Amino acid sequence: MLKEEDKIFINLYGQQSYDLKSSKKRGDWYNTKALLDKGRDFIIDEVKKSGLRGRGGAGFSTGMKWSFMPKNSEKPCYLVVNADESEPGTCKDRDILRFEPHKLIEGCLIASFAIGANNCYIYIRGEFYNEASNMQRALDEAYTEGLIGKNACGSGFDCNIYLHRGAGAYICGEETALLESLEGKKGMPRLKPPFPAGFGLYGCPTTINNVESIAVVPTILRRGASWFAAIGKPNNTGTKIFCISGHVNKPCNIEEAMGIPLKELIEKYAGGVRGGWDNLKAIIPGGASVPLLPKSLCEVEMDFDSLRTVGSGLGTGGIIVMDRSTDIIYAIARLSKFYMHESCGQCTPCREGTGWMWRVMMRLVNGNAKKTEIETLLNVTKEIEGHTICALGDAAAWPIQGLIRHFRDEIEERIKNFGIA
């Protein structure tokens, strides 16, 4: 359990103002120049030592990603912050954007300095109107106070931060599709290689990080890499914002230590499962794109490695709780429809496969199918998985794979009952 003094996002619930004055009282912008004066290598090394892994879903080492940027590039370098939070069940970045914007802005300055980027773009989800308004006001305050812009914080480093609003496409949360959108093109993922660190925004070296990944950096540097690394578990260090929704008594966002047991997280902060733990049917532990877990596996620890061991993933940390009243087959079919709708259509397996999977899922929902179709559906998900430019194909396949893995009997029972009816 995370100690109160170890929490990074003190204003996660918006109980205080998000303005600069209040943010400074919470410790933001304290001695930022001194942090920058320690140099780029020190900053990257500290972030590496902290063990910070990307909080957007992939879990890649943040410090390692920064180190891929060229040190003496002839082209300008860019930092891009992915604030296009559109994953069903996920709303952590939204609260940072509207209640803790200065943590993000300060993190942008430090990260930009570390990778040698004089320009940073925050790409924010189009539907986040109020969040974008709060963010822009915070940016204006930071410019007025000389915290960013020319000679940011008196460091001699110039850093401009721009807010760019998206237009509502889930696919633009994929880093290269986001870059295409920023350039004014249709948001469609790029083939890799080349990777963004070598050929990113406008063909220049670019680092793309999640909102939460960037927002925790100033606190890590102030309190030390060893402090952050001591929280959580080895290889799964630090704090994480978890979003708990669905059939719980008190849906909430909560910052906790990595590795906290899923059951403890739900019972301590979300008031428990509606109707008690015995009424639990399944949980999606990391946003809509990771496989669900049946009740028998729901006491797993919430970190990248533990969830991978049980056949799921931490993803974004968006926990969706489903009790026994849930039509689990329809719940996953609804996710299939989402991915069908959000496919950009570039890759044939995803373009054709997501629609096909949804149609078969609806047959299974009604029970109007043959048992052999279950195996056919599973085989098709495996043909889509890993055969697309981006991970949307994987994201569409995994929920169905999880359903068949853990609730195959229920699907077969529905098919059997349809014939009887």
From Swiss-Prot:
Bound cofactor: record note: Binds 1 FMN. Binds 1 [4Fe-4S] cluster.
Residues engaged in binding [4Fe-4S] cluster: 344, 347, 350, 390
Reaction catalysed by this enzyme: a quinone + NADH + 5 H(+)(in) = a quinol + NAD(+) + 4 H(+)(out)
Residue numbers binding FMN: 166-213
Family annotation (PANTHER family): NADH DEHYDROGENASE [UBIQUINONE] FLAVOPROTEIN 1, MITOCHONDRIAL (PTHR11780:SF10), NADH-UBIQUINONE OXIDOREDUCTASE FLAVOPROTEIN 1 NDUFV1 (PTHR11780)
Known function: NDH-1 shuttles electrons from NADH, via FMN and iron-sulfur (Fe-S) centers, to quinones in the respiratory chain. Couples the redox reaction to proton translocation (for every two electrons transferred, four hydrogen ions are translocated across the cytoplasmic membrane), and thus conserves the redox energy in a proton gradient.
Name this protein carries in UniProt: NADH-quinone oxidoreductase subunit F
The organism of origin for this protein: Rickettsia typhi (strain ATCC VR-144 / Wilmington)
Primary gene name: nuoF
